[in-house]
Amino acid sequence: MKGQYLMTKKIILIVLALVVALGIGCRSSIVKNVHDAPMTFATENKPSIEQIKKAIIVAGSGLGWRIKSQSPGHLIGTLNLREHTAIVDIKYTTENFSITYNSSTNLSYDGTNIHSNYNGWIQNLEKAIIVQISHI
């Protein structure tokens, strides 16, 4: 009787450990990068690379990103939320743009996976850039 009780207790502990492990795993996702997202514009005239740059900066700033110029066609975006920091490379031409992971703090990045909130931030940034560029 006592042996059966101990066995049941062990099984319950194993099941609880698996549930906790699965719950922790659900909080991370594969890093989302945006590759060569096409741009559409309000007019037939193609905007200049400087207009594109300004539109990306406005889009990111509206979401709390600090966007700094790295080189022509290359911006660095930094988002600080509470104790979390995400840094991305934003590369752009007059045809398309890309957002790629650069580095992070307190987002549990392991080389492939990252805290699931990160992907939401990137998706929001991508949408904001698309909207801002569509008004040029």
Name each model feature, range by range.
Residues G3-L13:
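Bacterial N-terminal signal peptides that target proteins for export
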